[in-house]
């Protein structure tokens, strides 16, 4: 964050990094919204970038090893940014919600790079998560998202675009089917850019704005569904 501030010449801006795996962007939205609501700041810039190819395992010794780590083959690099500003329009507010399931804190973790496993190359990749655990928590996540929308009095049909963590096309469509969301209303871009983790959401939002699918000041509603290692579910809803 300090480097971004320096390169932008934003010398008066307070800045800090936010880390929450694939949910870092939604976490940043929540923090930015709280800052703006407090009246302490009027404008917040959120930047999100990922270099995920560093964690892809390229060398395999046997078929079993491929089956253990092939989820990393879908990783991709990318970055995006969003600028938030205070508004007097009561119809353009933001709501966010999180659920942390700390009993899964060690699932889907890349252990290498820290002080514990600095020089162990086998720790610089991520092992696949147990399919039964994934299925169980996909259903839990869907319930969390549904409850979050209900809490905000938002119906499925009220939303113009859904943006999710890009864990895979099959999983995204499975979530859409569970919540009865039309496939054309939910973003799938992992087939083009891979899973860019926390950068997925700002990339998707930017592409939708550039294509004309969304436009600022239109009153369109966007809902974001996040899922991150740890295990955390995140939700954000806002009107453009």
State where each predicted segment sits:
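Conserved short secondary-structure transition element at the edge of the structured enzyme core
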Residues: 152-156
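Short coil/turn connectors at secondary-structure junctions
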Residues: 10-14, 38-44, 69-70, 78-79, ...
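Claisen-condensing/thiolase-fold acyl-transfer catalytic domains that form or cleave C-C bonds
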Residues: 1, 6, 11, 18-37, ...
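Flexible, glycine-rich phosphate/dinucleotide-binding loops
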Residues: 53, 90, 102, 171, ...
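Condensing-enzyme catalytic core mediating Claisen C-C bond formation in acyl metabolism
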Residues: 60-135, 143, 236-240
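Short, well-ordered, mixed-charge alpha-helical segments that flank or form enzyme active sites
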Residues: 25-27, 52-57, 102-105
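Short beta-strand segments
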Residues: 19, 43-50, 75, 84, ...
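Flexible, glycine-rich active-site loops centered on histidine and acidic residues
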Residues: 35-76
